[in-house]
Amino acid sequence: MVRYTVDELFHLKPTESLPVQFDAEEFKAIIEKVKQIQALKEEEFNAHGGHFNRRRSSHHHHGRPKVKHTKPKVTTDSDGWSTFEAANKKVNEDEESENVSVAVVPETLKVKPNNKNISSSRPADNKDIIADKQTHSFNAFAALESDEEEET
């Protein structure tokens, strides 16, 4: 087959007659082969959803999921008053709470100090940590009685 340079291909025009050396059948066979290869590539591309083994991005989840809430039942009396009906779940929970007795066990709470925030070099003692406990209480009646005793 005769090979043409790029410049020669630009100068060729479809209205001109082809030179004697040009083999049109072989050229058409090459074009058909390229068309078949291109069709196979497009078919494979479309079979995979328009991408070649590309990971799907998680960017397509934009909003919150839609939660379907059921509308409460509204009953209207003969007087024209509208009231909401209570849900059945609340009734079931009340019945279960009556059947099950809850055992309350006193828990001992161990307080662990956070030594990295304490500026002292010695570790904190558990007795020092519980500072919220009131050491002595003020009794107003006892104070009044002591004042009266001092005056007499």
UniProtKB/Swiss-Prot annotation:
Keywords assigned by UniProt, alphabetized: Cytoplasm, Initiation factor, Phosphoprotein, Protein biosynthesis, Protein synthesis inhibitor, Translation regulation
GO terms under cellular component: cytoplasm
Main location: cytoplasm
A molecular function GO annotation: eukaryotic initiation factor 4E binding
Start-end of Polar residues biased regions: 114-123
Cell compartment(s), UniProt: Cytoplasm
InterPro entries per record: Caf20
GO terms classed as biological process: filamentous growth; negative regulation of translation; positive regulation of cytoplasmic mRNA processing body assembly; positive regulation of translation
Bias (Basic and acidic residues): 124-133
Stretches the record annotates as Disordered: 46-133
Superkingdom, taxonomy of origin: Eukaryota
Matching Pfam families: CAF20
Ranges annotated as biased composition (Basic residues): 51-72
Family: Belongs to the CAF20 family.
Function: Acts as an inhibitor of cap-dependent translation. Competes with eIF4G1 and EAP1 for binding to eIF4E and interferes with the formation of the eIF4F complex, inhibiting translation and stabilizing mRNA.
Protein name: Cap-associated protein CAF20
Originating organism: Vanderwaltozyma polyspora (strain ATCC 22028 / DSM 70294 / BCRC 21397 / CBS 2163 / NBRC 10782 / NRRL Y-8283 / UCD 57-17)
